[in-house]
């Protein structure tokens, strides 16, 4: 499932965000690429909004299962995403799922805590197309933005979640 896909992949980052689109974490050519963070994000998920990219593979690998979050039943089964880092197991609660335009405000990098994060998260929550329960955000929250291709070069499917543990 999606949780296993994220857990298995190393989150990669390099100055060119497109580098890992068609390379493994060992930098070997591979059509599926790997799951990787935006090149401007900290590798430890320490930014207020960390953007994570992965291909929408038909075989379900990488972020191929992200499209399942277009169906309300998927969220009803589990509204959480877990990410394993070398230091901790992080649990995130999904608050928004939608199709975004490439280069839209969805891809705003927010480095540190503050009111800007709350405003951003509230705006992204309003884009949700599944009718998820509204939540309150805090200036210290950590958000992840999972982004994958849709088959349309102008859009991406996005699932956003806020860290709830630890």
Stretches found by the model and what they are:
Residues 15-166:
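Extracytoplasmic/periplasmic soluble domains downstream of a signal peptide or transmembrane helix
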Residues 1-14:
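Single conserved hydrophobic/aromatic residue that forms the stacking wall/gate
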